[in-house]
Curated annotation (Swiss-Prot):
The gene is rnfD. Its EC number is 7.-.-.-. GO terms for cellular component: plasma membrane. It is a multi-pass membrane protein. The complex is composed of six subunits: RnfA, RnfB, RnfC, RnfD, RnfE and RnfG. This is Ion-translocating oxidoreductase complex subunit D. NCBIfam families: PRK00816.1, rnfD. The chain crosses the membrane at residues 24-44, 79-99, 125-145, 220-240, 248-268, 271-291, 297-317, 321-341. PANTHER family: ELECTRON TRANSPORT COMPLEX PROTEIN RNFD (PTHR30578), ION-TRANSLOCATING OXIDOREDUCTASE COMPLEX SUBUNIT D (PTHR30578:SF0). Belongs to the NqrB/RnfD family.
Length: 358
């Protein structure tokens, strides 16, 4: 006798653990690029995040009466922790990443029943909670370490994260005192300050002469565009490996680029559209966060609509909101719309009566 099983009867052969490991591997170019430009802080933040995430997930699954090792072996919690660790300032206090990781794992994932049940991206839940609750710590960024007279060593990074001082007793602001201009803000922050208030910089060309930009007349942000290109390379790798689909990142980036380009013709002073694409978390969000298979749309047309919606929200927040980046908020707002998008884009079952026909 044959045993009857439910569909699907064929599958891609990709296990969840394999997908998560491919995603982690694809993040490594950006991970090492971030170390090169911003120091060892991201290494320590990642270790703290992954350790906290594993402990939190273990306890949560144990309390639900299930076997933790069966769930931890899919590496999804490690990917969530790594995404959050790479999204926060590298030298944020240790308790920032611990709180954010606990919120991501417990409030963003386990409270809904675990992997596959959460409607919102867990890492972005943790990030947004941190950004709203601790805005100072979450917006204090060190400029690229090649601009510093004394770049922080691994020991300095450890000391800064756990005590707020380097091994020589210097604070983060004291390390950057020799750099002119805005030193503890991202280039997107600097541009936002510029076009909202002309009292800080006389004209846009003075802005892009700041050391945090390339200093050659372009508005590409030093360190940031290299990290975004690394995320782009990793994202293309995931598409070629068929770990993610192309529709979401392409729709997101094209929508944002078109809106940003159109805005440039209105005289609304801001960074160029191309510079916007390689600033902040744009490529990170497009290829590694918005493409989360659990919280994104599942239909081909729905993926395009979802990606375009994320791009629209990023544009609205960056150009007209109070936050300089907006990728995290854009993804969470778009996650809300996923059930509606899937409802209207799901293909009809063969033989199902269409509207107006009996």
């Amino acid at each position: 006798m044959f045993k009857m099983v439910s569909s699907p009867h064929t599958h891609s052969g990709k296990l969840t653990a394999h997908i998560m490991l491919w995603a982690i591997l694809a993040m490594m170019p950006a991970f090492f690029t971030q170390i090169y430009y911003f120091g060892f802080g991201v290494v320590l933040q990642s270790a703290l995040a992954i350790g906290t995430a594993i402990i939190a997930e273990f306890i949560a699954i144990k309390l639900r009466g299930k076997k933790p090792l069966n769930y931890l072996s899919d590496f999804s919690v490690a990917l969530t922790a790594l995404i959050l660790a790479m999204a926060i300032p590298p030298y944020a206090p240790y308790w920032i990443i611990i709180i954010g990781t606990l919120c991501a794992v417990l409030l963003g994932k386990q409270v809904y029943g675990g992997l596959g049940q959460n409607p919102f991206n867990p890492a972005m839940i943790g990030y947004v909670i941190l950004l709203i609750s601790f805005p100072l710590q979450m917006t204090t960024w060190m400029p690229p370490i090649n601009l510093l007279q004394e770049p922080p060593t691994f020991s300095d990074a450890f000391s800064l994260i756990f005590s707020g001082l380097t091994t020589d007793g210097f604070t983060l602001s004291q390390l950057t005192h020799n750099i002119d201009g805005i030193t503890q803000a991202t280039p997107l922050d600097s541009a936002k300050i510029f076009y909202k208030s002309h009292t800080q910089l006389n004209d846009f060309y003075e802005l892009i002469k700041l050391p945090i930009f390339m200093g050659n007349g372009t508005d590409f942000a030093q360190g940031w565009w290299q990290i975004n290109v690394a995320f782009l390379a990793g994202g293309i790798f995931l598409i070629l490996k068929r770990v993610i689909h192309w529709q979401i990142p392409v729709a997101m980036l094209v929508t944002f680029f078109c809106l940003a380009t159109a805005t440039a013709f209105t005289g609304f002073t801001h960074l160029s559209a191309i510079s916007q694409l390689v600033s902040g978390a744009m490529m990170f969000g497009a290829f590694f966060i918005a493409t989360d298979p659990v919280t994104a749309s599942i239909t081909p047309r729905g993926k395009i609509i979802f990606g375009a919606l994320v791009g629209l929200f990023v544009y609205l927040i960056r150009y007209h909101g109070n936050y300089p980046d907006g990728v995290a908020f854009a993804i969470l707002l778009s996650n809300i719309c996923v059930p509606l998008i899937d409802h209207y884009t799901r293909p009809r079952v063969s033989g199902y009566p269409t509207k107006g026909r009996k």
